[in-house]
């Protein structure tokens, strides 16, 4: 007796349709699973056996061999429990459908779900990736857990059926027309936290302006300042001024978090991610990896913000791993038998104190760090990383008068978001025929063609380049930031004043310039 069923697993971020072949023959009672299963799939033998019995079916006391294909892909999803169980029931004749009809149904249907010993179905990670891959294989029907089905309703081309138990799935297979598809209310409860607002940040108007520029042009930022000056407040409020996620971005962001097992609700993510890893985070947790090649923090921050607080406290090799994603918006994770390309398109914000105690150069509090400690701390961030930063901000401790200023004098997130949307709209119109949609993503070869620089600006740019010893990359970033400032002003051309403002964010005063920057010069 033989049956073929389709299940799915996840390889990196991508789903892989798995062919589950079940053969039941005469012989001693044996239940074998072959086809490169990992430990979780091997253990499914006991879960499937108990679930079938406890759901009121008979488990065949014969030789059962389950083959999972393709053989070269490692099967790591416990969601293969359900297709294995359905295969056993179909091969043993316990699903009461005529064989031609049953065979046709099984050939066009995907089964995904982890089984409990009592036959109940659990939520499976990576369901969106599996469903998207099923579409490519022309599989348009999915049976899964009720906890998963609400996510699948967001893919219009797929008909999804959800159930709580294995017995209910079998009933649905035999009578799918009697199943009523419940509509899912996507009320965007994941909206940006309304309790945080840039209006709460007093005395940091220059920092707020830099955040507007970063949000409008998708530029990377580094903030330097003493403890308590407001660096974290500026960073964590950045998502409140970013444009809302598009439908495609919501689907992609949700898929990433679903594979990582971090999806809190069974609905699409509505707010842009904000990730803030601790400085003790490992390299694998930042860039991705591990035994199952899970996405790291930089991929979880895709289409959102990655905040590296206390950046000099991170191991240097961890920070240096950001070089590729900051430039290419992708990260390649290599494993023994495969390599994975993960998206990593985010706004990076680095925050640092000027020294270990935090008060080097402070006019009111004396620094207690030795020269050796200063030297070691201030060279933790390498030059290549700094060369990829667009905006540098000195965040000073606000004065007493700044703290007492009226709310009406401080820009709110709503005011800043309006400016950001204006800048983004100009970029969308400019880049409508381009694969990139932001100034920060402008490739080197397109900068002069698309930035629209006034002819009389080249003299200033030449003086700046020679005086401050720019690299080619940092000069490109100056032009990109200037273009964003011009967009915020509604200007079609980059003017001298736009370049002058961009230069403000490339210059760091001497008393904090030792963090990768020397002699008070521009990075």
Predicted ranges, named:
Residues 118, 308-315, 358:
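Catalytic P-loop NTPase motifs of RecA-like helicase/translocase cores
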Residues 303, 309-310, 321:
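Walker B catalytic acidic pair
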Residues 225, 288, 310:
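The Walker A (P-loop) glycine that initiates the GxxxxGKT/S ATP-binding motif of P-loop NTPases
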Residues 59-62, 105-106, 136-138, 156, ...:
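Short loop/turn elements that form and flank the Walker-type P-loop nucleotide-binding site
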Residues 212, 267-268, 273, 284-306, ...:
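Conserved alpha-helical scaffold flanking the Walker A/P-loop in AAA+ ATPase domains
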Residues 40-45, 60, 67-77, 292-293, ...:
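Basic, amphipathic alpha-helical bundle interface domains used for macromolecular binding and assembly
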Residues 223-262, 328:
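Walker A/P-loop
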Residues 1-222, 229, 334, 475, ...:
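Peripheral, non-AAA+ core regions of ATP-driven protein-machinery
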């Amino acid at each position: 007796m033989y049956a073929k069923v389709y299940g799915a697993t996840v390889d990196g971020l991508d789903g892989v349709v798995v062919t589950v072949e079940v053969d039941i023959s005469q012989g001693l009672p044996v239940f074998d699973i072959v086809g490169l299963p990992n430990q979780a799939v091997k253990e499914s033998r006991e879960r499937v056996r108990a679930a079938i019995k406890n759901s009121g079916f008979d488990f065949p006391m014969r030789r059962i061999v389950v083959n999972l294909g393709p053989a070269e892909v490692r099967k790591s999803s416990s969601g293969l429990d359900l297709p294995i169980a359905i295969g056993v029931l179909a091969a043993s004749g316990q699903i009461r459908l005529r064989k031609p009809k049953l065979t046709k149904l099984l050939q066009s249907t995907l089964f995904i779900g982890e089984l409990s010993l009592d036959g109940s179905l659990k939520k499976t990670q990576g369901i969106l990736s599996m469903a998207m891959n099923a579409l490519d294989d022309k599989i348009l029907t999915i049976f899964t857990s009720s906890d998963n089905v609400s996510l699948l309703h967001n893919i219009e081309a797929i008909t999804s059926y959800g159930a709580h138990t294995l017995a209910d799935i079998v009933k649905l297979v035999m009578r799918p027309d009697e199943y009523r598809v419940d509509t899912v209310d996507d009320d965007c409860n994941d909206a940006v936290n309304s309790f945080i607002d840039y209006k709460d940040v007093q005395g940091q108007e220059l920092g707020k302006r830099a955040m507007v520029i970063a949000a409008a042009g998708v530029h990377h930022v580094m903030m330097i300042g003493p403890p308590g000056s407001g660096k974290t407040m500026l960073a964590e409020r950045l998502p409140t001024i970013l444009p809302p996620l598009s439908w495609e971005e919501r689907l992609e962001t949700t898929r990433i978090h679903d594979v990582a097992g971090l999806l809190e609700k069974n609905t699409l993510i509505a707010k842009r991610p904000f990730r803030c890893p601790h400085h003790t985070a490992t390299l694998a947790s930042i860039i991705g990896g591990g035994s199952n090649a899970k996405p790291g923090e930089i991929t979880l921050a895709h289409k959102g913000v990655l905040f590296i607080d206390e950046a000099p406290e991170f191991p240097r090799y961890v920070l240096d791993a950001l070089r590729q994603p900051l430039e290419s918006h992708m990260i390649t994770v290599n494993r023994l038998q495969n390599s994975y390309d993960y998206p990593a398109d985010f706004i990076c914000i680095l925050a640092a104190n000027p020294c270990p105690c935090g008060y080097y150069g402070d006019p009111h509090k004396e620094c207690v760090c030795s020269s050796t400690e200063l030297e070691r701390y201030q060279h933790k961030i390498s030059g290549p990383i700094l060369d990829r930063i667009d905006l540098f901000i000195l965040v000073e401790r606000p004065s007493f008068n700044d703290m007492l200023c009226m709310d009406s004098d401080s820009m709110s997130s709503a005011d800043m978001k309006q400016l950001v949307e204006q800048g983004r709209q100009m970029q969308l119109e400019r880049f409508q025929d381009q694969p990139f949609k932001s100034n920060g993503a402008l490739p080197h070869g397109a900068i002069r063609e698309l930035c629209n620089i006034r002819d009389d600006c080249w003299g200033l740019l030449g003086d700046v380049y020679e005086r401050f010893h720019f690299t080619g990359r940092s000069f490109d970033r100056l032009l990109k930031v200037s273009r964003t400032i011009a967009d915020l002003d509604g200007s079609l051309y980059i003017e001298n004043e736009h370049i002058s403002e961009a230069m403000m964010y490339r210059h760091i005063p001497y008393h904090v310039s030792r963090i990768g920057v020397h002699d008070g010069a521009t990075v």
